[in-house]
Amino acid sequence: ENENVLYLNIEAYAGFGGYFPWEEGQDLSHLLYYSRQENDMLCARMTSMVHRMGSLDYVLPIRVTTDLHTVTTEEWQNLFQRLSKESIYETLLLDIGDSVADLMSLLEMCDWIFIPYAEDVYAKAKMEQWQYMLEVLKRQHLNQSEIRINMEQNMRQAVAEAITELRKREGMS
């Protein structure tokens, strides 16, 4: 609430018409294009792409899934570094799906990883597979960055609990 946050949805099917209005205009693929240009016009270009939902700024997600698959880890890193250094945003909130190439490297860049979960047998099996994958890939240290959000709760309550956990871990509680 007290800082500038930019939400970027990096999922293959982000929910146009539901979460996001189906509108024409520039989206995350355009922001990536401008980031690749290596000039100082990224933030100027970005101002026309930023939309607002309540107190949250966001750029429309990539509309065509195949565009998402072509973005390299280095391009994501470059974009995130440039946004951190050149824009007004102190925090980037990334909604990452598994359609991203080299997901683990992208997660390595994050200070915190919020993981939605539920208590049903299928959700538990997915979490077990996630833990197994971290172990096989020798990325168990990512567990220390995880904050889980119980999706069976009221969303406001779940997010409030996640924020409380985050503050506790950062020594702000």
Briefly describe each language-model feature range:
Residues 78-165:
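Conserved catalytic-core segment of NTP-binding enzymes
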Residues 23-26, 41, 74, 101, ...:
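Charged, alpha-helix-enriched surfaces in structured cytosolic catalytic cores
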Residues 7-9, 58-60, 115, 148-150:
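Structural signal for conserved beta-strand scaffold positions within catalytic alpha/beta enzyme cores
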Residues 12-14, 63-66, 120-121:
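Conserved nucleotide-binding/hydrolysis micro-motifs of P-loop NTPases
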Residues 166-171:
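Short, hydrophobic alpha-helical segments
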Residues 41-50, 60-94, 124:
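Cytosolic-facing regulatory segments adjacent to core modules
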Residues 3-58:
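Phosphate-binding loop that captures ATP/GTP phosphates
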Residues 9-11, 61-62, 96-97:
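Fold-independent oxyanion-binding glycine-rich loops
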